[in-house]
Amino acid sequence: KTNPEVLYSQAHKALLNQDFDNSIKMYEALTARYPFAPESRQARLDLIYAYYRGREAESAIDAADTFIRENPTHPRIDYAWYIKGLVDFARTPNSLERLFNVDLSERPPTTARKSFAAFRTVVEQFPKSDYAHDSRRRMVYLRNRLASYELSVARYYIKREAYVAAAQR
């Protein structure tokens, strides 16, 4: 039987060694066995990052949402918002789309909107955060991506002579 300090230390070491699968298992075990231990709250925050780096996007989003909901006054809540934004940002164009120069303006920007919203939360609610500057930079990129999509949709409507729909874009 391990205590929460030892389990957290092992999980954190695995995370630092980029062994995301093992760190995820240990962080999950820690939060399940010792939900009220002081290490558990930090483990939940680290788990968001481990899911993100372990390419478990949905788990990362769920963990971030849960952390934000359960810890609204935590001093590092900006980090949870930032990682949440990064998860959706990473899904915005994937490497194959970049390689083959896929026109992103023709793809629905659902994840781009979610990412923009998370980064905006960091910038607006935590302007002095370590993550605010990077969030602002990513917002500029996402704003341009969203604008390109809207222009693409407007062009489509113009081709179809649906001028009212185009004007609404």
Where in this protein do the model-derived segments appear?
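Acidic, polar-rich low-complexity tracts and alpha-helical solenoid repeat scaffolds
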Residues: K1-R169
